[in-house]
Amino acid sequence: VPLAFLGRHAAGNAAVAVELSLALCRKDFDITDEAILEGLAAVENRSSIRVVSQRPLVILDACRTPQQAAALLRVLNMAKVRHMSAIIGLTEEEGAEAFFSALETGLTPEEQKKDKSTMPGMSENPFDKVYLVTPQGTDTALTERLTEKAKYHFDAELCATLAEAVRLAHANTRRG
């Protein structure tokens, strides 16, 4: 059954739903295999990771915490995705260093404390380049500071507009 979602957590939730359905069947509830499969197929993707298009590959992810960034990187690495550009628009400086580090290494701040072997800029990563944009209602000076922080982890560039970032990301892609 093709699932409407990506990621380990969503797949785990699907497995729990199947097991719960089977447990109810053992308690004499009438749930057919077809009903379980139809239910899985009908699930709407409410996760932050969304594939917008396949060619070129465009993924929209609303991640903004180190934990969400690490989860996104795990999904991309599991799918063996490489040579992507990321467009990032953060509204706060607090936690930005941990966010960029997690997006680079796949490790949350807690995991990074345990694993000292990962140095910034040395990890295999799906992102060839990241473009930073200023979200509406956010100060451009903040995005300038965030771009400097991002440069410790990625080839990072500040863009004046989202349209400019999309144009540059598309021009930079090495994917079909």
Model-identified regions with their sequence ranges:
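Nucleotide phosphate-binding/pyrophosphate-handling subdomain across enzymes
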Residues: V1-K129
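C-terminal helical cap/extension that packs against the catalytic core
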Residues: L57-V58, A98-R175
